[in-house]
Amino acid sequence: MIKRKLATFMLTLILVMTGVSMIKVISYAQEESAGSSTNPKERVTEYKYSAESDPQNGVVLKVEWNEPKLGENTTFHVSADGGSDRYLFRMDAPSYSNPDEYSFESVADPSRGAWIQYTDECESHDFEFTMTASGVYNFRFYVMDKTLGVYYMRVSTNIQVSDRAYPSVGDIVNAAVKKCSKETDGSDYEKALWLHDWLLKQLDYDHSLKWSSAESALTRKLGTCQAYESAYSKLLTAAGITNAETRDTYDGHTWNAMKLDGKWYQVDCTWDDTKDNYYNFDQTHLYFGLTDELMALAHNGHDQIYTASGYGTRSTSLADNYFVRNGDATKWARAYAERIQKNLNAGKTKFEVSTDNASYPPSISGIQNGIIAYALNQMTWKAGSKKVACGRNIHQAFFYCKIYGHSKARENSICSKWRACEFRK
């Protein structure tokens, strides 16, 4: 689907725009521009490529650069003419698109740090940026000349680069999905799990909160939650798995919803990417295949999102939860089996069983116990001819079980109530 360009480092589509930018900005720029300069003696005096704006109050903004090389810094010399020579310059967070697609995603978070900061007053300024994937990068530069009343004047340029040593994001995704197809049985669950595990091996969380795209995740090996979500979404889409972004605007976090075997599930690759092993189970899959209810235990703001009308990826099943599928949920449930059966044998019709993980934080214990409660309700209990349902208590660290008759309506009522409960210590 993605055509590889034969020409290396081809430069195309130079777009020049002026006026107030309507493009939202992200933050991480000039840490890469730490070596930028405003000293004319340190600048290159001749450049191969350039783009400039139309005049505004007599001021013209110009950007110049030489042949870019993937994996190396490209210097962008930004200057202005016709004004006071007391200019303030800014570089926006670059955006990236696969070749021939022209569907751009900000490489970095445009709302933070140097991306939103103008330089001190100067005649010109050098910005630097390293391109890391074959494709098209969009660069935007701004100037202010307050003396002449020029604000937010912009020049924008697209630069297409190609190098087989630096594949496009699309090529990286397609190669991963091709390998996934060879190493799994082709089911939605197996593909989603394989791609989840593959992605976690590719990158680390960017604690500087700068890199926030699939490009940064797959080529810079760093990213925020937005990078994890974006990269995983591209992988799932390429594998034929329906997915959507779940954005917790209350907590400032994002993750994926995916549709496996016709049902929606929540998965948080960012929180699964951990080296911790504090809780005696595989934490790298704790947030794979959760219900909305359980995910809200980790991300409290999600409780207000998934309960709102119009929410489109409602997730209520644990059938394709990682621990349910690999058998750990059943093992955990069996740890409570003797205690539950002992109460049943004693003729109790309603009782509580303390959990073994009460010391864990709610985002850990609550999710684990929700999965255990699901497994408990898949088990068969000896209680004469009566049914037994088990749930987790919303406020205390225990499971509770209740015996009831054969009424299907009553059974559904109880199970629905308990599955809707949250678990908190």
Indicate residue ranges for each PLM-predicted region.
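Hydrophobic/aromatic-rich core segments of domains that either
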Residues: 227-293
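Exposed beta-strand face motif in extracellular beta-rich ectodomains
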Residues: 133-139
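Conserved structural position at the C-terminal beta-strand
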Residues: 143-145
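Sec-dependent signal peptide cleavage junction
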Residues: 19-37
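Short, compositionally biased P/S/T/A/G/V-rich stretches that sit at domain boundaries
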Residues: 31-68, 313
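Short glycine/proline-centered coil/turn motifs in the loop regions
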Residues: 81-85, 96
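Secondary-structure boundary elements
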Residues: 166-217
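His-Asp-centered catalytic microenvironments across diverse enzyme cores
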Residues: 263-266, 270-366, 370
